[in-house]
Amino acid sequence: FGPTRNPWDTSRSAAGSSGGAAVALATGTAWLAHGSDMGGSLRNPASFCGIVGLRPSIGRVAHTIAAAVDRNLGVQGPMARNVEDLALLLDAMSGEHPADPLSLPVLPNSFLSAARSGSKPKRVAYSPDLGITPVDPEVAAVTRKAAQRFAEAGVIVEEAHPDLREAHECFHVLRAFDFALSKAALLRSKRDLLKPEVIWNIEEGLKLTVEQLERAEAQRVAMTARTLEFFDKYDLLLAPATIVPPFPVENRYVAECAGKKFDNYV
């Protein structure tokens, strides 16, 4: 079928991995859609295609047995053409499931009622880069305008972000570990059918040491604690959904952003 193209400019990528879902929404082919997200697979397509996508907190949408080991890194989430539709789908998706001990109960008030309430946050943090990543100037400008909209509505907006300095190392290790656990058998039996990026990620996971995994889990715990403390002060954190605008559809992944080159797709 070829690559999934951006509905606003077919020379550009729709992003992935839920690019097809985002395009279906943007073109009116679908009313609601589902996406999965470990490292942006739901958020990047939503951003590239001009629709709404939400990566929920872990446990908000329950995993099933089919999720295998991927229970505390990747999540399932809703995609829609507007916030109210997305909230409606999240209400339908959320809730406890006996197959997932980390799943959370349904909240007393629905997400749809919250979306329709018209209430606004009191204090919002804004960060163009979360202190950890380059961001294309065009993306940074769009994010800055969004922050200004909050300020114009009377919300206190301050430039701040939680301390996420270990995020890249932690995510690289835990993602590779997940790939090794869930896909090593595929590498052994069907290597010729796997794309180079997946092969690389599995092999990175197979090379990990116990010490690296221990360090990554400790980093995750520390970042979670610092982020929870951060939200004692702020109601929301505004940040770019993706670091670049839609790139040419021929490109396999983002190779450079704001002068920084990347040697892998993660």
Task: Describe the residue ranges of each PLM region.
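Short, surface-exposed loop/helix-turn segments at secondary-structure junctions
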Residues: 4, 102-106, 215, 247-266
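Short helix-loop capping/hinge segments that flank enzyme active sites or metal/cofactor-binding pockets
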Residues: 113-127, 174-228, 240-245, 249-252
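Short, Asp-centered acidic motifs that coordinate Mg2+ and/or phosphate
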Residues: 31-32, 235-237
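Short, well-ordered beta-to-alpha junction loops that form the rim of enzyme active sites
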Residues: 129, 162, 234, 240-243
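Short glycine/serine-rich loop segments
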Residues: 1-96
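A short helix-breaking turn/cap at a secondary-structure junction
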Residues: 52-141, 145-146, 164
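Acyltransferase
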Residues: 110, 114, 135-160, 183-189, ...
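Glycine/Thr-rich phosphate-binding loops of Rossmann-like dinucleotide-binding domains
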Residues: 42-43, 134, 246-248
